[in-house]
């Protein structure tokens, strides 16, 4: 089962550049799927970095307020223990890879925690089966598509069996088909009762998965929506909030129109 997260009066700033987050208070229930969305630079990524403990320990920043995980202050949880509680999936999975081959990457966290050889093998094969990457365990990470790399990143996190998953724009480099396959993985994690926090611009693939959508602007949570409320927003309301449309059909129509009307900038003949 996932873990409850409580945030109280959280403010984050980076080196005198103003507050990136301002007085955020938020309750996330165990097993809830939360999507944080909003314009670039609004503070979504900073909020994920606080939840997973990267601020202030990896990213230098001044932090005030409190974050609790299952009632325990996050700052009192040692970094090695946080790594077992929170699994991370980033926009570019290559930024979190430490191995050259898939099996080694999935096993990396288990090895760090001193699991026995038998335990590592069991955890790797369970995670690979859950994420459906059994047939590429012996492949080089460098030979994989973005979609497959993202699967490996999730399998690597799942091998340790965390109760919380934090994902920062995980679909950014995926096409539509790969994005929906990624959504199936999130659905499986949700069914397992995991707590999932996703910072994301693309919303269409999360409409049937998210329990709540939080709109972040200028470091503050300004609006909160259920999926039904999100679907009911007009195009004008979506634009005012700085969001992308959650309607895939509208996205596809826009892409088709853009392709049909694009100006030719390079033409080669008889090369």
Describe these PLM feature segments.
Residues 118-136:
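Conserved ABC ATPase "signature" region
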Residues 140-144:
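Conserved ABC ATPase signature
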Residues 1-7, 12-23, 55-60, 78:
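A short, flexible loop at the N-terminus of ABC-type nucleotide-binding domains that lies
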Residues 165-168:
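Catalytic Walker B motif of ABC-type/P-loop ATPase nucleotide-binding domains
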Residues 200-201:
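H-loop/switch region of ABC-family ATPase nucleotide-binding domains
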Residues 66-81:
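ABC ATPase NBD Q-loop/coupling interface
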């Amino acid at each position: 089962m996932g873990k409850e997260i409580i945030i109280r009066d959280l403010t984050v700033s980076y080196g005198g550049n103003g507050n990136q987050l301002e007085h955020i208070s938020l309750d996330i229930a165990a097993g809830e799927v939360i999507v944080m969305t909003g314009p670039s630079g609004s503070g979504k990524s900073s909020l994920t970095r606080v939840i997973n403990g990267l601020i202030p320990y990896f990213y230098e920043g001044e932090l005030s307020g409190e974050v609790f995980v299952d009632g325990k202050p996050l700052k009192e949880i040692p970094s090695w223990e946080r790594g077992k509680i929170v699994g991370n999936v980033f926009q570019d999975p290559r930024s979190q890879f430490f191995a050259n081959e898939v099996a080694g990457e999935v096993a990396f966290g288990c090895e760090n925690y001193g699991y026995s050889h038998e335990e590592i093998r069991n955890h790797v094969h369970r995670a690979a089966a859950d994420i459906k990457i059994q047939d590429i365990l012996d492949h080089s990470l460098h030979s994989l598509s973005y979609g497959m790399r993202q699967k490996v990143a999730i399998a690597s996190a799942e091998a340790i069996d965390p109760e919380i998953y934090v994902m920062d724009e995980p679909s950014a480099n995926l096409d539509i088909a790969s994005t929906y396959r990624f959504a199936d993985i999130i659905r499986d994690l949700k069914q397992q009762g995991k707590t999932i926090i996703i910072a994301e611009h693309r919303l269409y693939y999360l409409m049937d998965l998210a329990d709540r959508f939080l709109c972040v602007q200028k470091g503050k949570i300004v609006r909160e929506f259920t999926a039904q409320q999100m679907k009911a927003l007009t195009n004008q309301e979506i634009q005012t909030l700085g969001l992308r449309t959650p309607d895939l059909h509208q996205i596809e129509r826009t892409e088709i129109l853009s392709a049909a009307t694009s100006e030719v900038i390079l033409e080669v003949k008889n090369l």
